[in-house]
UniProtKB/Swiss-Prot annotation:
SUPFAM superfamilies per UniProt: Trypsin-like serine proteases
Cellular localization per UniProt: Secreted
Chief location bin: secreted
UniProt KW RNA-binding keyword: no
Domain Peptidase S1: 31-272
Name of the protein: Tryptase beta-2
Secretion signal, residue range per the UniProt entry: 1-18
Entry annotation: catalytic residues: H74, D121, S224
Organism whose genome encodes this protein: Homo sapiens
Swiss-Prot/TrEMBL catalytic activity: Preferential cleavage: Arg-|-Xaa, Lys-|-Xaa, but with more restricted specificity than trypsin
Gene Ontology BP, a term: proteolysis
Assembly information from the UniProt record: Homotetramer. The active tetramer is converted to inactive monomers at neutral and acidic pH in the absence of heparin. Low concentrations of inactive monomers become active monomers at pH 6.0 in the presence of heparin. When the concentration of active monomers is higher, they convert to active monomers and then to active tetramers. These monomers are active and functionally distinct from the tetrameric enzyme. In contrast to the hidden active sites in the tetrameric form, the active site of the monomeric form is accessible for macromolecular proteins and inhibitors, e.g.
Amino acid sequence: MLNLLLLALPVLASRAYAAPAPGQALQRVGIVGGQEAPRSKWPWQVSLRVRDRYWMHFCGGSLIHPQWVLTAAHCVGPDVKDLAALRVQLREQHLYYQDQLLPVSRIIVHPQFYTAQIGADIALLELEEPVNVSSHVHTVTLPPASETFPPGMPCWVTGWGDVDNDERLPPPFPLKQVKVPIMENHICDAKYHLGAYTGDDVRIVRDDMLCAGNTRRDSCQGDSGGPLVCKVNGTWLQAGVVSWGEGCAQPNRPGIYTRVTYYLDWIHHYVPKKP
């Protein structure tokens, strides 16, 4: 089944910058059809940086506890990256302009992760020190296990990724936001089978995944690992983690996210429920 799925999805792409490892061609990178985020919004958004000629943004993430960041496994695994070459930047309006990079003490990749398309595309980063929570920087709320995020619910995805297929976010690199509707998994799966070489009995969109977006609005390369959030009864809940898709805002190819409720037990094995 694994080989069948990998062979059947040759053009899907995960949404992270930098050369992907074998089988990781599907990661996501940017916001298509969105606009610059207001400075007062999305205080849990973080940027993951890797040391190159400078500390380069390569993925997003979310602050779920003063000392823990939630991101996509394909950003930091399956082989754990060198901690010395990894940093976290908390919420900033423009990349690189007021960096205060934080070191990471531990990377935990879900043990079942192999590629984003197979699932379990989720990872945790433990910061060396807890951050000071403020109105500008604070945690996002994880959903209760019972939350389903029904089809059509308007949600938001944020990041500093590409603004279109193969079109990088230009300076001054503002944080972007876009509203996307939730889509039922079985409808999303049917859409991904259109024009694909997979049989209808092969599940492309799995139970631990969540679909959102349309042909005008989507996440894209560079947004990988970032949060998909939905407002439920006045509280922003993180429904998903940007994972993969085919192109960005393409017909019949919604964005695919790791479903956070599916992994709550795993998350709370490491992350305290209360700071």
